[in-house]
């Protein structure tokens, strides 16, 4: 009996985590919109193989009109709205956006809850087209709307 109790004690957190993971993936799959807040970021500039990274201010935006069948969505912020291409997998949504100047924006929203915030874990990368090359990586959460 004691052995069985120990086995259940060890397995129970795994069962809870699996159930939580399934719920997070369902939340992601059913989201028609996501409000994303990226509080932590780092920006990197480099020239001639010399890299300089520094912290960067965070930001937020909303991904609306998510259509997994067509594979697209719309990014909406205070600066306006833009078209996004989307790759929809059961456990993640990748949103890709391009600016007129050639910058690439990639946002990945995971079917995994942030334990302290309750939202879905997310990252946002910006790859600037200008020279010298500049990139930034943002970390945060997205809440389904």
PLM regions and their residue ranges:
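Short, solvent-exposed loop/hinge segments that bridge or flank secondary-structure elements
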Residues: 25, 30-72, 106-112
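Short, intrinsically disordered, charge-biased short linear motifs at domain edges
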Residues: 19-26, 125-132
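N-terminal signal peptide c-region/cleavage motif recognized by signal peptidases
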Residues: 13-18
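Sec-dependent signal peptide recognition
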Residues: 2-8
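Short, surface-exposed coil-to-beta transition loops
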Residues: 58, 104-110, 121-123, 134-138
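Edge beta-strand at a domain terminus
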Residues: 55, 127-145
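Contiguous, well-ordered beta-strand patches that form the walls/edges
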Residues: 68-107
């Amino acid at each position: 009996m004691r052995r069985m109790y120990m086995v259940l004690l060890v397995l129970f957190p795994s069962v809870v985590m699996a159930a939580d993971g399934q719920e997070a993936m369902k939340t992601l799959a059913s989201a028609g919109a996501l409000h994303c807040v990226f509080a932590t970021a780092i920006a990197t500039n480099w020239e001639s193989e010399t890299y300089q990274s520094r912290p960067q201010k965070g930001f937020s935006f909303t991904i609306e009109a998510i259509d997994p069948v067509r594979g697209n969505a719309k990014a909406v912020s205070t600066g306006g709205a833009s078209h996004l291409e989307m790759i929809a997998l059961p456990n993640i949504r990748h949103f890709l956006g391009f600016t007129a100047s050639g910058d690439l924006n990639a946002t990945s929203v995971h079917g995994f809850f942030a334990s302290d915030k309750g939202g879905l874990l997310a990252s946002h990368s910006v790859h600037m087209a200008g020279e010298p090359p500049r990139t930034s990586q943002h970390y945060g959460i997205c809440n389904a709307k």
